[in-house]
């Protein structure tokens, strides 16, 4: 399909997280967080590299202790992906991480402590050119805000963020981004909509503690989708109680669905019914597994019968329409050849890879021309 996205992104100030631009006209960055023990350097490095292979732009790493800060330094030396140090409670850990090297510091207004501690972090970040993320979370609001509002509300999240933004402003520090996360979709969306009109800094989106793989993916798709449709959001994290790689995959699927960023294959597949001329579900599962390594944006239609098959296949780069006795393959929107069921997956995979390689050559040539 060639319907253009109607989304007009919110204007925001651009910052750099390592070599990755965030905000402005930069692509929306997709990030995740390690769930290894940070002091286990080898395991953490391995997970970061796996996330990088999955397409992560940025990875956040929890740094709960000084020992973890030293481990973080070793991790940073072994990876190329920008790393965000996740700091809670002890501002001195942030100072140490800034000293040993980090691409961004995440601090939580609800537990980082007094203003003088925030000032110390700002000073260290300014000296090293490190951006800060003000990461507000509904589950850890300041005690006075909990008392004032009685419970987490969008207004409480925004007030928490604005307090710390005021501190940054008074110290002439504009190199920051903001997040306001809750596990409730409506609270999160309302908070982001409020603050989007008050500041020009980039916004990092997320539904915190969203749930397991299925429920968390759905909740995140709805919440982030609502904000992204409004043009709000410069970087996203899909929080799942699952393999962090799934966070990256779901994140890209959300952006792909809204035509905000393309990576890998966009499958158009029917849910199957008794009219199918091949096993659609089995074929789709096999193709997705085999083609995970392809990063080139490509539309692939997999439709089990001739009701909608030809129409969908004509709009895709490569299409498969079920038929009897043979299935019809479309290339570039036109019927090309037929395939029998016994050779379907292998031959169709080969065709998709060939088409992806050709398209990547075209994209590379365009980039080379500038």
Swiss-Prot record:
UniProt KW keywords: 4Fe-4S, Iron, Iron-sulfur, Isoprene biosynthesis, Metal-binding, Oxidoreductase
UniProt binding sites for [4Fe-4S] cluster: 270, 273, 305, 312
Record's catalysed reaction(s): (2E)-4-hydroxy-3-methylbut-2-enyl diphosphate + oxidized [flavodoxin] + H2O + 2 H(+) = 2-C-methyl-D-erythritol 2,4-cyclic diphosphate + reduced [flavodoxin]
Gene Ontology biological-process annotations: isopentenyl diphosphate biosynthetic process, methylerythritol 4-phosphate pathway; terpenoid biosynthetic process
SUPFAM superfamilies (UniProt xref): Dihydropteroate synthetase-like, Nitrite and sulphite reductase 4Fe-4S domain-like
Functional pathway: Isoprenoid biosynthesis; isopentenyl diphosphate biosynthesis via DXP pathway; isopentenyl diphosphate from 1-deoxy-D-xylulose 5-phosphate: step 5/6
NCBIfam families on file: ispG_gcpE, PRK00366.1
HAMAP family in UniProt: IspG
The protein's name in its UniProt record: 4-hydroxy-3-methylbut-2-en-1-yl diphosphate synthase (flavodoxin)
Organism: Hahella chejuensis (strain KCTC 2396)
